[in-house]
């Protein structure tokens, strides 16, 4: 999540820290196992319109928060999935130890 880079709101510091750990693991492990032909990458989503917002009681939260996104809209789960599909493809065969940010420029 972009919280790893941007930080979390006061009550979400633990969430941001866990996301930062994923970034560190991705980069470090990617370097460690590259000579074995293993690629390690991650996707760092920004504000994404998913059902988690409705489950937390604010179904429009992604759209409400989109004002801080340069593209002025939340992302979609499919946009994140497309990044994952690219990372899994032969087109990304030289990509490892990388965290792809899917955040509309934020």
State where each predicted segment sits.
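Catalytic tyrosine of NAD(P)H-dependent dehydrogenase/reductases that use a Tyr as the general acid/base
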Residues: 15, 23
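A glycine/serine/threonine-rich, flexible loop-to-helix segment
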Residues: 35, 47-69, 79
């Amino acid at each position: 999540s972009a919280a790893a880079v941007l930080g979390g709101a006061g009550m979400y510091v633990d969430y941001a820290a866990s996301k930062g750990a994923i970034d560190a693991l991705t980069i470090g492990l990617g370097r460690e196992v590259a000579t074995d032909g293993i690629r390690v990458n991650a996707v760092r989503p920004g504000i994404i319109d998913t059902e988690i917002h409705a489950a937390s009681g604010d179904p429009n939260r992604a759209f409400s928060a989109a004002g801080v996104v340069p593209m002025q809209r939340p992302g979609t789960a499919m946009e994140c999935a497309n990044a994952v599909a690219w990372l899994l493809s032969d087109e990304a065969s030289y990509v490892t130890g990388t965290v792809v940010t899917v955040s509309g420029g934020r």
